[in-house]
Structures are given as structure tokens and as C-alpha cells.
From Swiss-Prot:
<dbReference type="InterPro" id="IPR036678">
    <property type="entry name" value="MutS_con_dom_sf"/>
</dbReference>
<dbReference type="InterPro" id="IPR007861">
    <property type="entry name" value="DNA_mismatch_repair_MutS_clamp"/>
</dbReference>
<dbReference type="Pfam" id="PF05192">
    <property type="entry name" value="MutS_III"/>
</dbReference>
<dbReference type="Pfam" id="PF01624">
    <property type="entry name" value="MutS_I"/>
</dbReference>
<dbReference type="InterPro" id="IPR016151">
    <property type="entry name" value="DNA_mismatch_repair_MutS_N"/>
</dbReference>
<keyword id="KW-0227">DNA damage</keyword>
<dbReference type="InterPro" id="IPR005748">
    <property type="entry name" value="DNA_mismatch_repair_MutS"/>
</dbReference>
<dbReference type="GO" id="GO:0030983">
    <property type="term" value="F:mismatched DNA binding"/>
</dbReference>
<keyword id="KW-0067">ATP-binding</keyword>
<dbReference type="Pfam" id="PF05190">
    <property type="entry name" value="MutS_IV"/>
</dbReference>
<dbReference type="InterPro" id="IPR007695">
    <property type="entry name" value="DNA_mismatch_repair_MutS-lik_N"/>
</dbReference>
<dbReference type="GO" id="GO:0005524">
    <property type="term" value="F:ATP binding"/>
</dbReference>
<keyword id="KW-0234">DNA repair</keyword>
<dbReference type="GO" id="GO:0005829">
    <property type="term" value="C:cytosol"/>
</dbReference>
<dbReference type="InterPro" id="IPR000432">
    <property type="entry name" value="DNA_mismatch_repair_MutS_C"/>
</dbReference>
<dbReference type="InterPro" id="IPR007696">
    <property type="entry name" value="DNA_mismatch_repair_MutS_core"/>
</dbReference>
<dbReference type="InterPro" id="IPR027417">
    <property type="entry name" value="P-loop_NTPase"/>
</dbReference>
Length: 819
């Protein structure tokens, strides 16, 4: 970076600040631009596609201050930490070099600026390891703060993958593991001091003498302290977030990342998903809450029924539903507005949005009170008429983006501001009024008020009228035909006009700061209201979707899973003639082996079973004519097959790792959905594993299971075990080929129709005909059927010990890292 002695004072200042923020791109304010130098300049030039120049032979690139947000978004999305260095004084007023300080460090997990955020949650997570993984994670934009612990690294990583975690901060020993496991995640290693003095940091942040009442463990204190220190470092503030909430696994159905992906629950690589189908919310808050519900279905029947009852109330009252949703469409993102208020970074437009949202609360409450099932919810919505009054009195309805130009604080709020604003905007009119007043007082009709650069404002009186000049006039200049005077009032008026712009800026900014302080007293109550409005939005949304798509209210049973004419909530939206199918499972039908050709709908059928279970437990109605559903503690899926190139794991290894997780973690109350397990290895190995796994799930776990497979040999299990049944997909053969009817019926697929599917896909006729010849030969010589018969007759050893694999057996069913 060159010899420091040869640098200008400004560049020395830059180097000193950069030394403190080595790991960040430093954007250094110079007038109307933010400049970057040296390596930072080369990076932003490349990422932002802007010109790279030089200053004192140092690479330099700059961005206009008014376009900062657009460029920041690109830098952060590209995985960079950015430090914003501002000028702390007016360059024209500075004595020597302008004072500059870093006012903000922006990382993927510490964004509060609306322009840089999507509507989704954006979590920053701190994590430590001491026998288990303990985490604290916060959405800085909404203030939500959670604590969660994990027994294994696999569980921790799984949670991170599905939970809108955009950044993880951790100790050195976890850094490498996380970067290897989730390469695209922004992970930052923290120095050891972040994890020290944590109890004092928590007390300081919340302004408490004691934190015993928070009921958090020592490890949770440690990780919270680190999180709060990091927030202070990036936001330059030590503002208290919401009190931490512990995410209790016992309250929610567990959905691992593979299940979330396989069932297409939320937006991801696969495109069409349940969230997009269900999400017709009116507010960003409601959309975020709906996504949380989908990822954390309820497990307590009482809580499910309470939510379902509210959904049903709206479902049965479409006029009320439409009215409430119309009101909600006028509610802004209060969670994020209130967080910006808490950090002192709220804008005038934010506060007007808050006011407009609060205006709607009384109307929403009145509407809800018309339905007896919603009266209690209406009572939980607190009105903030005092806040509305404060904002109505203080702010214009269409204020500027920032205070200081005189177009934010409403007229009548401050006499002093009004006076200076009147001078600034109406000085000519004021001078005319002053001139007319002086003419009336003196009787000098030709008296006029003028201005020049030497004397400023003056009163000019013709020579013939000088005798009428009052004593308080002070002579300043004698001309040939007139005399010029000033008065104390005119001098004060001049001083006001000359300083009016500066005064308007200072006073309006000061009043806006006072307003923010006054409103901050209401933040906790307003956050509770925001939470209630987001719940109202999510609940009424589920009712609207249920009416729109013809869903039915599910009943909850002790164990029977019966759904009449069940449909796949996502697929049916994109297929004009979707074929509905029944689901029927109980103790006598605990496991289904589902066979049928490719493209027949096996995978769609078993996936819709999982989707209906999830939808029911978030309190939603479900796509069916009738539904009786048990409450599941977890939904497991094992579907598809692909290599993981990034970790070097083969298809079969990944498949067996997922199978191992199911066999270890599933309980009698779980739902297991399997699709083509065993396809990643040889036919004999695949059938052996699939058979043994099916027996283990049936005998040792005893949960409800659907297993879609091309191994028709597995259908023989139904002759061995009373509770295993077979399903297949109807196919009609015609002269023109095969027609897949997508209707699920009891029975076994007589063949896979793979060659017919190949023909439909456009495989050349010669290849198709040769395939038919080979199939005839292989079918005649196969001894697999004979061997399966031996299996069925009881020659295969049964797994005897529940939840335990016999010692010495190949450790396919052990969870953990597989070398």
C-alpha cells in the first residue's frame, strides 16, 4: 500500500480506519461519493462493474452516495462485509481534515434497511459447541430472538438449511466444519473475547441488574453475549432486542431439510412449492409467519384446534373474511418499522406507514366482534390512539424521506420551526408585510425595503420624507435622493432569513429525534400488536385459500388416517385433470407397498400424504372431500437419488445416510414416506436392504409408512405381515400404447412398463424393440422370484432388538459422518 509517510493526511486517515476493519470492504465518504481504495477498489470494480481509477497511484473506485443502497445490496449478496465510513462534520466547517467514522458494518445477517431486504426472514445465528450445539439467532430487521440447542452437528446443519439463516458467527473450531458442510453460507469466525464477559453484556443490553428471570442456561448466556457484542460492532448500537424465546422441539412436528425439500414445502431449487400455493397473505409479516408455520407444524392437539377454529370462523363468514383482508391490505410491515425505530434508524415515511396501519385497528376490531368465535381475538388487539394522535400532530401525510428540508414536521407542531420555515419558504411575502407595516406606522407611502451585499436588508426613504422617520430607525447610508436605514426588527429578520435554512434543518432533525424517543416508549406494545396482526393475516389467508381451492376441515383421530379424494396441493394447481385418491391407514394397514410404472403417479401420491399431514397440523384445511388424521411427531422422507459432488458422497451413500436417520429417529407417531430406496446399488443388494428396512420399520418402530418402489418383490411382505398392504396405480393398455390413469387401487403392478415409457419419451424404435427382446430373455432366466419365495417362507433372519442393530452388522443404520 505504499509508504505511509508519503500519503496525504486524508489517505493516512483512510489507512488508520481500514486497519480497524481489515476484513470488510471500507466505503469511505468523500463529498458526494463513497470511495474504495487498493484491493477494496478492485473488488467493488469487478463486483459492481464500475470504473477502476487511481489516486496517488492507489487503485480507487467510487459510487454516488445517493445510489449506495443499490450497490450495497449487490456487495452483500456477493458475500462481502461492508463498512460505511461517513463524514461526521461539514467539510466547509472543518478545521483541518474532515472527521470521519465508521457508522455501520453491513453483513448478510445484520441488515435492517428495507431496500436491502426481501419479505422473508433474515436471521443472524451465533453458535457454540460444548457437548451439544447451542445457538441464539435473531432477525435484526424484526427483532425476533430465539434460542435453540441441537444434540448433533447433523441436526444443527439441517436446521440452518431450512430456517432463513443468512449468516452464522462461531468459534474457530466450528468455522471449518460449517464452511465445508454449507459452502455458500456466510460464516464468520469470532475472536475468543466475544465469548467472554457475556453475563455483563446481557445485563448491559437489557438494562438489567439481574438476568435470573430470563431462565437461560450458562451456554445460552455465552452465545447470547457473543451475539449482542457482534450486533453492537455492526450496528454501532446496543439496543435491546426482544426477550429470547426458546424453540422447544416438543411443541412442533420435526421436519428435516430433506423432507422440506422432498415435499417442496417452501421456495427452493425445485420451483413450485406449498408456501407459494398457500401464500395469499396481505402483509409481509403474515407471509413470514405462514412460512414459519409450514416449517414448524404444531404437535399439541389443543393448539392445532384453537388455530383451526379461527380459520373455520373466517371460512364460514366470507363477507367478514373479505372485509378483514381488505383492511389488512393497508397494514405495513410493522415488525421492521418498529425495529428500525428501536435502532433510531426509522424514516418519516416509516412513521406515517405506522400511523396508517394503526388507523385500521379499530375497524378491524369492530369487524371481528361481529363473529362470536373471533371476539376474543378482537380483544387481544390493542388500539394505540395516543400514538396515532402524536403522529397525526407531528408529521405531514406525505413527508420527505429524511428530516431537515422542512417537509417532515407538520405546521403548528413547533412555533419556532414554523417561523423559520415561513421565512425560508415565504421570505418575500414576509418582507412585503414588513414594508406595508412600516408604511402604516410612519405614513411614508414611498418607503421600501431592499437588499444589497454590503448592508444586507435596509429601509429606503425618499429625501422629502426623512422628517417623518421615527427615532428607532438607524441611518446606514446617504444617497442623492434618499436615505437608507435599518431597524432592530429588520436586522433580526435578516439574521433569521440568512440562517433560516440551517435552522430549519437543525430544528426539524431535533424534533424528529424527540419524536422517535417519545414513540420508543410504545415499542413493546406495538410489537405485540404487530404479532397479532400477522397472525390474523396468516389465519384469514388459510381460510381464503381453503375456500378458493375447495379444501375441507380435517378431524384429528387417535390413530386412523383416512382421507377421501385426497389431492396434491401443489400439483393440482398446475394440472387441469388431477385425479384424486383415497388414503386409508390404521393399525391393520400400517404400511403400504406402492408399485406401478414410471409416470403413473406413485411419487405424487405418497408426497400428497405428507403434505396433507403438514397442512392439517398448521391449522389449515386440506385438499380432500373428507379427512380424519392422526397427529404426527415427525414426517420422514427418503426420495430421489443423486450424487453430492460437493462432498464427494455417492448416491447410495447419501441414500443410506438418510435411511439410517429414519431408522434411528422415527417413533410410532412418525409418518415415513419412502420412494425407491435401494435403487442406488445392485438389484439383489437393493431388494435385501429395502426388505430388511421395511421389516424393521414395521416390527420395531410401528409407524405409518408408505413405500413406493419398482421392486415388486417387496409386495410379498403383505403375505408375511398382516399390517402390510399393497397398492398400485391403474394402467390401461390400448392399441395406441399405455394410458396412465393415476388411480390408486389395492393390488400389485404386474410390470413396470419402463419400455413403454421409453417409447413415449422418444427413444428410437430400434432400441425399444431390442429392449423388448432382452426383457423376454432376462425374465425367463431370472431366479429372483424363487429367492424371494424363500425369503417369504421365513428363511431371512428377523431383526430382534428394538432400535438396535446387531453387533458386527454393516453400520448402514448409524447416524453420523460416513467416511
Amino acid at each position: 500500500m505504499g509508504n505511509l509517510e508519503k500519503l496525504t493526511p486524508m489517505m493516512k486517515q483512510y489507512m488508520g480506519i481500514k486497519e480497524k476493519y481489515k476484513d470488510a470492504i471500507l466505503l469511505f465518504r468523500l463529498g458526494d461519493f463513497y470511495e474504495a481504495f487498493f484491493e477494496d477498489a478492485e473488488i467493488i470494480s469487478k463486483v459492481l462493474n464500475i470504473v477502476l481509477t487511481k489516486r496517488q497511484n492507489a487503485p480507487m473506485a467510487g459510487i454516488p452516495y445517493h445510489a449506495l443502497d443499490n450497490y450495497l445490496k449487490k456487495l452483500v449478496e456477493s458475500g462481502y462485509k461492508v463498512a460505511i465510513c461517513e463524514q461526521m462534520e461539514d467539510a466547509s466547517q472543518a478545521k483541518g481534515i474532515v472527521k470521519r467514522e465508521v457508522t455501520r458494518v453491513i453483513t448478510p445477517g445484520t441488515i435492517i434497511e428495507d431496500e436491502l431486504l426481501s419479505n422473508d426472514n433474515n436471521y443472524l445465528m451465533a453458535v457454540i459447541f460444548d457437548e451439544k450445539y447451542v445457538s441464539a439467532f435473531i432477525d435484526v430487521s424484526t427483532g425476533e430472538l430465539f434460542l435453540k440447542s441441537f444434540d448433533t452437528f447433523l441436526e444443527f446443519v439441517d436446521f440452518v438449511k431450512i430456517s432463513s439463516i443468512s449468516q452464522v458467527i462461531c468459534s474457530k473450531e466450528l468455522f471449518d466444519k460449517l464452511k465445508e458442510e454449507i459452502p455458500h453460507l456466510f460464516v464468520e469466525e469470532l475472536d475468543e473475547w466475544y465469548f467472554q464477559g457475556y453475563e455483563e453484556k446481557i445485563k448491559e443490553t437489557y438494562g438489567l441488574f439481574s438476568i435470573e428471570h430470563l431462565e437461560i442456561t450458562e451456554l445460552e448466556k455465552k452465545v447470547l453475549g457473543a451475539l449482542f457484542k457482534y450486533l453492537e460492532y455492526t450496528l454501532m448500537e446496543n439496543k435491546p432486542p426482544q426477550k429470547p424465546k426458546r424453540l422447544e422441539g416438543s411443541k412442533y412436528m420435526i421436519l428435516d431439510s430433506k423432507t422440506v425439500e422432498n415435499l417442496s414445502l417452501i421456495p427452493g431449487e425445485k420451483g413450485k412449492n406449498l408456501f407459494d400455493i398457500l401464500n395469499k397473505t396481505k402483509t409481509s409479516m403474515g407471509a413470514r409467519l405462514l412460512k414459519k408455520w409450514i416449517l414448524q407444524p404444531l404437535k399439541e392437539k389443543k393448539e392445532i384446534l384453537e388455530r383451526q377454529k379461527l380459520v373455520e370462523a373466517f371460512y364460514n363468514d366470507h363477507l367478514l373474511l373479505n372485509e378483514v383482508r381488505e383492511y389488512l391490505s393497508g397494514v405495513y410491515d410493522l415488525e421492521r418499522i418498529l425495529t428500525r425505530l428501536g435502532y433510531g434508524k426509522v424514516s418519516p415515511k416509516d412513521l406515517v406507514s405506522l400511523k396508517r396501519s394503526l388507523y385500521l385497528v379499530p375497524s378491524i376490531k369492530d369487524a371481528l366482534r361481529t363473529n362470536e368465535n373471533l371476539v376474543s381475538f378482537a380483544q387481544s388487539l390493542n388500539e394505540f390512539n395516543e400514538v396515532v394522535g402524536i403522529l397525526e400532530k407531528a408529521l405531514y401525510d406525505e413527508p420527505s424521506n429524511a428530516p431537515g428540508d422542512g417537509n417532515v414536521i407538520k405546521g403548528g407542531y413547533s412555533v419556532e420551526l414554523d417561523d423559520y420555515r415561513n421565512l425560508l419558504f415565504h421570505s418575500e411575502e414576509k418582507l412585503k408585510e414588513f414594508q406595508e407595516s412600516e408604511r402604516e406606522k410612519t405614513g411614508i407611502q414611498k418607503l421600501r425595503v431592499g437588499f444589497n451585499q454590503v448592508f444586507g436588508y435596509y429601509i429606503e426613504v425618499p429625501k422629502g420624507q426623512v422628517k417623518n422617520v421615527p427615532d428607532y430607525y438607524i441611518r446606514k447610508q446617504t444617497l442623492v435622493n434618499s436615505e437608507r436605514y435599518i431597524t432592530q426588527e429588520l436586522k433580526e429578520f435578516e439574521e433569521k432569513i440568512m440562517s433560516a435554512r440551517e435552522k430549519v434543518e437543525l430544528i426539524e432533525k431535533s424534533l424528529f429525534e424527540e419524536l422517535k424517543q417519545k414513540l420508543s416508549e410504545y415499542i413493546d406494545g406495538l410489537r405485540n400488536l404487530a404479532q397479532k396482526l400477522s397472525e390474523l393475516d396468516a389465519i384469514s389467508n388459510l381460510a381464503m385459500v381453503a375456500r378458493l381451492y375447495g379444501y375441507t376441515k380435517p378431524k384429528f383421530t387417535g390413530g386412523e388416517f383416512y382421507v377421501k379424494n385426497a389431492r396434491h396441493a401443489v400439483v393440482e394447481r398446475y394440472v387441469s385433470d388431477f385425479v384424486a385418491n383415497d388414503i386409508y391407514m390404521d393399525d391393520r394397514r400400517r404400511m403400504y407397498i406402492v408399485t406401478g410404472p414410471n409416470m403413473s403417479g406413485k411419487s405424487t401420491y405418497i408426497r400428497q400424504v405428507g403434505l396433507i399431514a403438514v397442512m392439517a397440523q398448521i391449522g389449515s384445511f386440506v385438499p380432500a372431500d373428507d379427512a380424519e388424521i392422526p397427529i404426527f411427531d415427525r414426517v420422514f422422507t427418503r426420495m430421489g437419488a443423486r450424487d453430492d459432488i460437493s462432498t464427494g458422497k455417492s448416491t447410495f451413500l447419501i441414500e443410506m445416510s438418510e435411511v439410517a436417520l429414519i431408522l434411528e429417529k422415527a417413533t410410532k407417531k412418525s409418518l415415513v414416506l419412502l420412494d425407491e430406496v435401494g435403487r442406488g446399488t445392485s438389484t439383489f443388494d437393493g431388494i435385501s436392504i429395502a426388505w430388511a428396512m421395511s421389516e424393521y420399520i414395521y416390527n420395531e418402530i410401528g409407524c405409518e409408512t408408505m413405500f413406493a418402489t419398482h421392486f415388486t418383490e417387496l409386495t410379498e411382505l403383505s403375505d408375511v405381515y398382516e399390517g402390510i398392504k399393497n397398492l398400485t396405480i391403474e394402467v390401461r393398455e390400448t392399441n395406441n400404447g399405455v394410458v396412465f390413469l393415476h388411480k390408486v387401487v389395492e393390488g400389485i403392478a404386474d410390470r413396470s412398463y419402463g419400455i413403454e415409457v421409453a417409447q413415449i419419451a422418444g427413444v428410437p424404435d430400434g432400441v425399444v424393440e431390442r429392449a423388448k427382446e432382452i426383457l423376454d430373455i432376462i425374465s425367463q432366466k431370472s431366479e429372483l422370484e424363487k429367492k424371494v419365495r424363500v425369503l417369504k417362507e421365513g428363511q431371512l433372519k428377523k431383526i430382534k432388538s428394538k432400535k438396535k442393530i446387531p453387533e458386527g452388522q454393516l453400520s448402514l443404520f448409524e447416524v453420523g459422518d460416513i467416511e
